[in-house]
Every structure is written in C-alpha cells, then in structure tokens.
C-alpha cells in the first residue's frame, strides 16, 4: 500500500516528460543524414566506378 503513491507520482512524472526526437538536428532544425546513409552513399560511389586501372578483378566485381 505504501508503493501506490510512489507509483502514481512516477506515472505522472513520466507522462509529463517532454518527448525526445531521436533524429539529429542542425541549428536550422533540418535533420542530419545518418551514418548508415553516409556509408550507403560511399558504397554506391565506389560501386558505380568503372574499372580500376591495372586491376582486372575490380572490373569483374562491378559486373556482379
């Protein structure tokens, strides 16, 4: 019975807590790209390159 007031107070504190946006923001409030997007973009750039000069395996890899 002693725990009920503590439980109610905790519920009220949790309900009144401000929500937190998990996305990173700039000072202009624009979302920043995630590291996953940066990695994906970097891999796409390397994948789109034609052949590596002097290395035939790279050309075969691009055909996959």
Swiss-Prot record:
An MF annotation (GO) of this entry: toxin activity
Residues bearing PTM 4-carboxyglutamate: 60
Propeptide: 20-48
Secretion signal span: 1-19
Tissue spec. comment: Expressed by the venom duct.
Superkingdom of this protein's organism: Eukaryota
InterPro entries reported in the protein's UniProt record: T-conotoxin
Post-translational modification: Contains 2 disulfide bonds that can be either 'C1-C3, C2-C4' or 'C1-C4, C2-C3', since these disulfide connectivities have been observed for conotoxins with cysteine framework V (for examples, see AC P0DQQ7 and AC P81755).
Cross-referenced Pfam families: Chi-conotoxin
GO annotations of cellular component type: extracellular region
Chief location: secreted
Annotated keywords: Cleavage on pair of basic residues, Disulfide bond, Gamma-carboxyglutamic acid, Secreted, Signal, Toxin
Annotated compartments: Secreted
Protein family according to the UniProt entry: Belongs to the conotoxin T superfamily.
Entry comment, domain topic: The cysteine framework is V (CC-CC).
The name this protein goes by in its record: Conotoxin mr5.1a
């Amino acid at each position: 019975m002693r725990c009920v007031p503590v439980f109610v107070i905790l519920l009220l504190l949790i309900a009144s807590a401000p929500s937190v946006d998990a996305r990173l923001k700039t000072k202009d409030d624009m979302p920043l790209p995630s590291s996953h997007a940066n990695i994906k973009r970097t891999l796409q750039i390397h994948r789109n390159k034609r052949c590596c000069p002097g290395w035939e395996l790279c050309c075969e890899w691009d055909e996959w």
